[in-house]
Amino acid sequence: MGDEVQALVIDNGSGMCKAGFAGDDAPRAVFPSIVGRPRHTGVMVGMGQKDSYVGDEAQSKRGILTLKYPIEHGIVTNWDDMEKIWHHTFYNELRVAPEEHPVLLTEAPLNPKANREKMTQIMFETFNTPAMYVAIQAVLSLYASGRTTGIVLDSGDGVTHTVPIYEGYALPHAILRLDLAGRDLTDYLMKILTERGYSFTTTAEREIVRDIKEKLCYVALDFEQEMHTAASSSALEKSYELPDGQVITIGNERFRAPEALFQPSFLGMESAGIHETTYNSIMKCDVDIRKDLYGNVVLSGGTTMFPGIADRMQKELTALAPSTMKIKIIAPPERKYSVWIGGSILASLSTFQQMWISKEEYDESGPSIVHRKCF
């Protein structure tokens, strides 16, 4: 695998697919992980209607389509649609021939073995890639931060994981998953804005609320105190202009929505918040490496982009950890794409080139080769 062929890096998230070329510092293509099919066949005959649409095109035509997310909580659940997303990635977004490039794919922590095999099989048999590799998302985020040991709190659109990593290897017994992420926060914000008298119900309106969330929400350092401030003054109020020109005002919703990350009971969930989950993950690790984990807590994924989240994590973990423990939260500015960036770094390392699963190895051993070569 010489330098003349650029490897492709594809990070398939529940909400967005990030794709591009190894060695680049950012993904070339970022589009929604959705596949849409016409609700009524035959209505648009003669308009050159396709039987399916992917990504932004599906998003823009959603009025006439039924939308599906093939990746739920980070795990691929619909392989036919997943294949369509990959096809769209290669041919429409990156405009490359997959049979000419090695492909690095990412997977969720604790991804079922059968899923890794299926990804491997599709790459070699459907797309005829010359070589491929499957890497764990959180591990790539850690690499992107320049570390090989630490605990990654990776929170995207569909799922949140805490993943302790020691010298480059994820520790599976200590990985914890929380089914609370960006999509849930958007839904919760829709709900509390409705209480204020604004109605957001359709999928189109959900996109507006997602934008409000991304632009105006933040994490309070002290929730109770912030609620008190919001009640006694209008200092925290912000206005937002809707696409139709109407202007809405949003106050304590700005920090009430992301607070659910720390208090899942807001969403009617019984699970521990992200701070406790991180702590529980660390406590499942050998006592000798805990210090290294507390000192390297790396935030990753779009749902860690809220202003104030790092300071709040620092405060909450300090309260949980032994009093002498040094705690450091690392929040890289590019953390929305750090999984992809880590993949770009890994796939362009000269030492990584012998790690690829080649077509020859696949033909000889079959899909199970992925468990021997990717760990």
From Swiss-Prot:
Met-1 may be removed after translation. SUPFAM superfamilies: Actin-like ATPase domain. SMART domains: ACTIN. The keyword Nucleotide-binding applies. There are at least three actin genes in A.castellanii. Coiled coil: none annotated. Belongs to the actin family. Its EC number is 3.6.4.-. This is Actin-1. It is found in: Cytoplasm, Cytoskeleton. Actins are highly conserved proteins that are involved in various types of cell motility and are ubiquitously expressed in all eukaryotic cells. Transmembrane segments: none annotated. Its main location: cytoplasm.
